[in-house]
């Protein structure tokens, strides 16, 4: 890997204590909801916590959300059952941050222009402050890759070219 672009990485360490507790509860609730009610209900709760209203997303001309493929649904299952629970129990410590710092020249931190300071946005800016890195803005919000695919790809090329990639 030459460069990693981390778009709104979810690292609870960079939330204030009250937000961390709320985020941990939302993770637990989304996980339990998934087991009882399935994907749609769980992701609705998760999205709402992160300021995403799927019924009110803005799209670039011609863009729309596509139905999820079987592979994407399997990825969502893994995300909800394995990754989400780890958010509230596994956090970077100083030694983990040191590992990231050692490779920070290969890291681009990014947020969406429409993220409106949601918790992922705050996590990203907290990580950037700890690492001494800038935050690049990309079109759209947390799901900007899907709502603004052309503009997002254009911005990604700009960011990578500016880094000589």
Predicted regions and their residues:
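Flexible "cap/lid" loop of the alpha/beta hydrolase fold
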Residues: 1-34
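A structural signal for isolated positions on well-ordered beta-strands in alpha/beta enzyme cores
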Residues: 3-5, 108, 136
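Membrane-interacting alpha-helical segments
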Residues: 9, 104-107, 164
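Generic structural signal for helix capping and beta-alpha/helix-loop junctions
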Residues: 13, 117, 144-145
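Low-complexity, flexible helical/coil segments
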Residues: 18, 38-47, 142-152
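Alpha/beta-hydrolase
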Residues: 22-29, 33-126, 130-134
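Catalytic active-site module of serine/aspartate enzymes centered on a nucleophile-bearing elbow/loop
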Residues: 122-165
């Amino acid at each position: 890997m030459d460069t990693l672009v981390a778009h709104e990485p979810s690292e609870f360490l960079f939330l204030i204590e009250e937000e961390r507790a709320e985020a941990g509860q939302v993770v637990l609730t989304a996980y339990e909801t998934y087991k009882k009610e399935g994907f749609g209900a769980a992701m609705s709760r998760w999205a709402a916590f992160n300021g995403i209203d799927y019924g009110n997303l803005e799209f670039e001309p011609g863009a729309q959300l596509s139905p999820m493929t079987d592979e994407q649904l399997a990825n969502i299952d893994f995300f909800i059952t394995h990754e989400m629970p780890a958010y509230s129990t596994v956090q970077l410590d100083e030694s983990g941050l040191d590992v990231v710092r050692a490779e920070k020249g290969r890291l681009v931190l990014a947020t969406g222009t429409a993220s409106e300071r949601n918790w992922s946005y705050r996590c990203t800016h907290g990580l950037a402050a700890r690492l001494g890195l800038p935050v690049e803005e990309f079109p759209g919000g947390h799901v900007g890759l899907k709502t603004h695919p052309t503009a997002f790809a254009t911005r990604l090329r700009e960011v990578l070219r500016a880094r000589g990639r």
